[in-house]
Structures are given as C-alpha cells and as structure tokens.
Amino acid sequence: MQREITRELVRRLLPGRMAESNKGSYGSVLAAAGSMAYRGAAALCTEGALRGGAGLVYLASVEPVIQLVLSRTPECCACGCRTAANGGIHPQDADALRRWFADRHAVLLAGPGLGESAADVCKALLGRNAPWAGAVLDADALNALAAGKYRGDLPANTILTPHPGEAARLLGLTVPEVQADREGAAVSLAEKYHCVAVLKGHHTLVAAPGGTVWRNETGNAGLAKGGSGDILAGLTAGLLAAGLKQGRTPEDAAVCAVWLHGAAADRCAKRRSMTAMLPGDLFEDLGWILGELER
C-alpha cells in the first residue's frame, strides 16, 4: 500500500539547522559529474546539493566544467581532473579521489553528465570497502550499473534515482512493463540493489528495502526538461549528507527531496508557466518552500 508524502511529513523529516553548528555539522558531498559534452549537469547537481543543506560540496570533473561551475556557484569546492579521451574524468584521477576521501565520510553523488566516462569512474569510486557515508546514483551511473560495468556492492545508505527507461535497464524489463506496475518496479529496485529507489515520473515513487512505498503528489509537466533530474539528484545528496549527521535515513532524504523538488516546480509554474520554466528557475522557488517549512 502506498503512503502519500505530505507537507507535514516533510517538515518533520527535514534536517534541522542548529545554532551551535558549523559546516561540518551538515556533512559533505562529492559530486562526480559533468564531462566535455554535458557541462550543465554538474552545475545543476552541485547547486542542488548546496541548496539541500550539505555543509560542503566538492565537484570532481574536468577543468572546463570546474570553471563553469565555479563561475556560477563559488561555494562549491573544486577537485579538478584530467580529461580522458572520451571527454570525461580520467579513471586514474577517480582512483586518487577515492583515496583522498577515504576518511572524510562524504556522500557520493555520481552520474549527472558523466557520459562515457561513467563506467570507469564508478568502477574506481565504488565497489567493496568504498569509503562513502552514502551514495546517490543517477543517470549515467545507473546505466553503467545496469550494464554490469562495475560491481553491485553499493555502499550503505545508497539511493538510486532512475527514470522509467533507466529502471527498465536496471531490472531487465521494458519501459511499458515498468510503467504498467510502477509500484512493483520500485519495490523490485529496492530489493535487488538493497537501497532506496526513487522511480521518477508522474507521481514519483520512493521505495525502501522492506517494502514501504511513498507516493509523491507534487510536481508537474514543466519538469519534463533536461536538467530537472540533475537538480533532484543533487538535492537528494545534500539532504542525505545533512540528514545522516542527525540520525535521518536515506528514505527520509528521498521522501523530502522528491516532495520539495515537485513543490518548487508547482510554485515555479505559477510564475513562469510549465512551458517556459527552466530547471534552473527552481532554485528560487525551492528557497521559498524551505523558508515556509522552517518558519
């Protein structure tokens, strides 16, 4: 049976901001994102992680992507990487990143805009004894996982954020089969990968290991544009990083993220229209929604 995500539920589950705190109190995120072909994805997901409340957000990417992101979001910390032949992060640099983050207990956000480098990057960053406090896997990281390009030994506190096409590849189904039983698909993802699964779409579903399924009623067709998912992935990672510091769960982070993302889109559509709104417009509305919840 599906449970509805409500405003009051999100208000209770959101990580709080404490007077006696510092940036270390709210966790950190390493976003392995972006490539020469997909630079904007890194900008959107890193800002999403910061807006989601993470104390520190690091971006690992190639230098042109780093330059773009820092010009837009100087609050982000840079981990510049060499460019591989495919335009993405060089796998040797991904190995170095894993070692550098070994004792930092960061949340890994992998996938947005990684392109063809995703398989090598995820193989280097994930696998047995990965150092991450949690992980959010999206986009190209999900496709690499579905193709068996890296081990399925995912860190504890992992969240997958597939759209129906990615979910179909992860489960070995067709998209019509996923859409015909979205709840069953979400539960199967959570059980197969031992993680929280966010099945995006009209009325996004959040499934946790054990069978609990949450249904989100916020959001609209204005989100059907490239970049919306990058923001959701970043927002989820930021909420996960901050929440783990306060005893929250990956399920809590995913539930809050999908509701906030959709609620921001609903407010944005009233300002911009569903047709004209852009994913980047959501940040203004997200701040307004969070402000209402904090009061």
Predicted features and spans:
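Small-residue (G/A/S/T)-rich helix-start motifs and N-terminal tracts that mark the onset
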Residues: 1-134, 143-159, 164-295
